[in-house]
Amino acid sequence: MNFCLKYIPTPIGRLCAVADEEGLLMLDFEDSKYVEKDLNSFKNCIHESNSILDLVEKELNLYFKGKLKKFSVPVKFSGTEFQQRVWEELLKIPFGETISYQEQAQRLGSPKAVRAVASANSRNKISIIIPCHRVIGKDKKLTGYAGGLDKKEFLLNLENTFYKD
């Protein structure tokens, strides 16, 4: 199976996107601490777009303009069963809202698994679309974002700016 790779410019840096014909497998900032390792896990990666990557770019452009609150891009998770449950829960956090890691653990039915939840969030390979940036510390402080706290703050401010009830 071939994987397509495309770099997508955004207001906060280029995103590295990898997809096959069925869904998005990776979307991460090119300067993220995990991007190189994650890219190496895809063999036969070709530098060209496909319909999934074209949709990713289109929807990201709309998102950064405040014209898209929910992505329709099909995603393909790659992780443990627990990680996948954590990432599915992230998809339930609405645009413009945040929850704490503790609240996310409670929603998963594992209230004592706060560190495990935070660790799974840090291994989310599909930034922005799977919105781990919407999870903050219980004291409302910004913590833990593989792309960098400056990017997390930008994304939360962007969503807050365009958030309407």
Locate each region found by the language model:
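Regulatory, non-catalytic segments
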Residues: R115-N124
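LysM (lysin motif) carbohydrate-binding repeats in extracellular/periplasmic proteins that recognize
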Residues: P111-V114, L155
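Basic nucleic-acid-binding alpha-helical/helix-turn surface characteristic of O6-alkylguanine DNA
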Residues: M1-K112, F162-D165
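Short Lys/Arg-enriched helix C-cap and helix-to-coil transition segments
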Residues: I128-V135
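…primarily DNA-binding HTH/wHTH and HhH modules…
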Residues: K138-D165
